[in-house]
Amino acid sequence: MAGITPAKAESVASGLSIIQAQITKGRAAKTGYTRAQFGPTWADVDRNGCDTRNDILNRDLTNQVYKEKTKQCVVVSGTLVDPFSGETINFVRGNISSMEVQIDHVVALSNSWQTGAFKLTAEQRKALANDPLNLLAVKGKLNSQKGDGDAATWLPPLKSYRCEYVSRQIAVKIKYKLWFTPPEKEAMIRILKTCPEKALPTS
């Protein structure tokens, strides 16, 4: 992604050791934040002819059915095993039904803005908003419930997924040089102590 060099040392260390070493700061003001600061919604950043939303649906769903003449890009239906709840959800594209499955920014964009993304270039913010590392297809209601919460204010109901979820948040924040708030770091350490050897995801 433009202008960002993923940290190499962190990829072999545990998430717990990495978060324990982080210096914390309070959230910056939300002043200046808009979704537009992160570029067009669901851009085709990897230039594969398919927008990011459909790329993630393709990655996370099974039994995909595609819209004709879209070169297996536009997903019209499929099955999601929601990582946040463990529920199986049948996705059907439509004005209302599409909301059943939403694409979650693991580190919410407004949260990222308040923890350092306001310092990034426009291209770096666009990369963050479309990075598969920071995106998951999830149950729509839980995505709405999460809002812009961090690990201190919201965690997936499915406890067995919390280590993966928190590890992914850490990986995103390290990659884009975002900081952690004290309550967020405390919550992450508490979760990762249940899986102390877990490494951070890279994709």
Map each language-model feature to its residues.
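Homeobox/homeodomain signature
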Residues: 6-9, 23, 28, 46-47, ...
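Short secondary-structure boundary micro-motifs
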Residues: 25-28, 63-66, 121-122, 162-163
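N-terminal module-boundary/linker segments of secreted carbohydrate-active enzymes
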Residues: 2-50, 54, 182-186, 193-203
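Domain-level detector of nuclease and nuclease-like folds
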Residues: 75, 84-203
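A near-ubiquitous, low-amplitude feature marking generic local secondary-structure context
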Residues: 16, 32, 39, 63, ...
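Secreted/periplasmic proteins that engage bacterial cell-wall peptidoglycan
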Residues: 29-102, 106-107
